[in-house]
Amino acid sequence: MLAIDNIGIALLLTLVAGMATCIGGCIVFFTKSTRSPDRFLGVCLAFSSGIMIYISFTEIFRKAQQALGGDTFKAFLLTNIGFFGGIAIMALIGAVLPEKKAPSSHIMMAGIYAVAATTIHNFPEGLATFMAVLEGGEAAPVTFFALAIHNIPEGFAVAMPIAYATGKKMKGFASSLLSGIAEPIGALLGWFFLKPIMTEAVSGMIFAATSGIMVYLCFNELIPLSLRYCGKKLSVICITLGFLVIALSLILLSL
């Protein structure tokens, strides 16, 4: 039987890893006024898009396929069904929502989608961190530190659109806090309630749908806004930088 002390330590470290998103969220306090969209917002949105697209295809999609059976045709097919299912869900939501006329409305919706998608992604990630620390071994500290570093750009990606849409930097920071706290909550829910029903197949489909949701958000909301505010050339550069930052964090995670 697992000791209560071990469970407490695992939960504490999961909380710390999740709260690393707040470090990324703190960046909003060091930016200039968020009252009106400008070139800097376009840069931030493009950078956030790079982060989310890269992590969707190289981490979340891959995790989904592994959970659904690994390198098999069936697993790849189910992962794609979940991926395009997530896109379809977002498209349906967009179809029933009222049309966004003001720029701030576009930015707010992009921010809300980003918070929702990242939070969903962080629930199972929190459980994974919790279990890795609980099981111990050499992989535990590496998993903890890598996921913590990996969460920093995610916090930035969700905080900036909310800060610009509302003109309130604290609200942007709060959105990163909400996203990060999903990890310890996911650990608790998974450990006490969802473990009996959270099969590999269910987890895989959730990951696949989350991947589709994040990609749809980037191409439908974040990238068009970045093109509007900072232009094509700078958007491409910043998207590529987003790829690079998240790639480095995933390389660290794989050590």
Which role does the model predict for each range below?
Residues 1-255:
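Intrinsically disordered, metal-sensing/regulatory segments
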